[in-house]
Structure formats: structure tokens, C-alpha cells
Amino acid sequence: MISTNDFRTGLTIEVDGDVYTVVEFMHVKPGKGSAFVRTKLKNRRTGAVIERTFRAGEKVNRAHVERREMQYLYNDGDNYYFMDTETFEQLSLRKEQLEDAIKYLKDNMNIFVLTYNGETIGIELPNSVELKVVETEPGIKGDTATGGTKNAVLETGAVIQVPLFIETGDVVRIDTRTGEYIERA
């Protein structure tokens, strides 16, 4: 059991028999009445995001999620294949199970596969990945009226905002949690 006062982003909890990850939370102390915690929870099985309010100090069950280190091998369109780094067993996951993680998957990348009661509920990427820029517009000197960023297409097909000095062929470090540029690698 965990108190709602100890909620943090990324925490996995059990609510009404389903597994949820805390996406966003806010402690609210109204002038009148008791304090409460307003949360956005993502269902790990369906991917649906719900809003739920808990009383401050309310106890909820923490979901015991197992993490297995695996290596991404390849995909065949709808299925993505991973290999356990210890037992060399292969696991296939559907595109829908991976969601936004697809944008940052590179061949031979080590990730964690999350399982709950023997059921695979998703993957966990490293906090940052290094990807090559395959296409971007040339940055024009003095062109900073728009905040100094431009679109760049990465080797995985993801499109992100990068500073004007980044050119095609550069390798950049990306934060996988936010999808934002961190630095040139």
C-alpha cells in the first residue's frame, strides 16, 4: 500500500483491478474542505488516460511490476521483436503495446520490458537516446525570429525540434520521456 501523498510521475498503481501509471498529479488544498490529489492515470493494458481524484493520505495498492532487460532486434511492420539478454528467449510485442516508444527504438538497443502478473504491459526506454538526423532544413544565419529551432527527421522516422546549428548527419541526444532535443552527441 502506498499513500497518495507519495505519488510521483511514473509510479505504477492498481485501481479497480487494473494497472495504471501516474502520468500527472497535483496536490490541492482548497480553502474550505479537506485536501485531495488530482491525477491523470494511464491504463497500462488499454493505453486510455483517465482523470481520478483521491483524498489526501488515501492508501492505494502499488502494482508490483517486473522489469526484464531485453534487446530490441527488429520489426516486421506490426510486431516488434525483443530478446532477453540472459536467457536469449525472444518476445514479440504489437505496435499498440509500444505506443510512442517506437519513435526511439534502434536496433540492438537495450530496454526494459514491464510485466504484471505474467502479462506484458509495455516497455521502458532509457531516459535518453542518441539518434542520427537524416533530414533537416539548412539553418540560415540570423534566422532566429522563430525561437531558433527547426524540424529534424531522425533515423527512426521521428520528427523533433532542434536548434538551427544542427545539420543532416549530426547525432543528437533525445529525452525519451518528453521527446525533446537535449544536446549534440
From Swiss-Prot:
Classification lineage: Bacteria, Bacillati, Bacillota, Clostridia, Moorellales
* Phosphoprotein listed as a keyword: no
Q: Which InterPro entries match?
A: Elong-fact-P_C, NA-bd_OB-fold, Rib_uL2_dom2, Transl_elong_fac_P/YeiP, Transl_elong_KOW-like, Transl_elong_P/YeiP_cen, Transl_elong_P/YeiP_CS, Transl_elongation_fac_P
Task: Name the Gene3D superfamilies on file.
Answer: 2.30.30.30, Nucleic acid-binding proteins
State the species of origin: Moorella thermoacetica (strain ATCC 39073 / JCM 9320)
A matching Pfam family = EFP
Subcellular location, record wording: Cytoplasm
Q: What is this protein called?
A: Elongation factor P
Q: Does the keyword Acyltransferase apply?
A: no
From which domain of life does this come?
A: Bacteria
Pathway it acts in?
Protein biosynthesis; polypeptide chain elongation
What does the UniProt function comment say about this protein?
Involved in peptide bond synthesis. Stimulates efficient translation and peptide-bond synthesis on native or reconstituted 70S ribosomes in vitro. Probably functions indirectly by altering the affinity of the ribosome for aminoacyl-tRNA, thus increasing their reactivity as acceptors for peptidyl transferase.
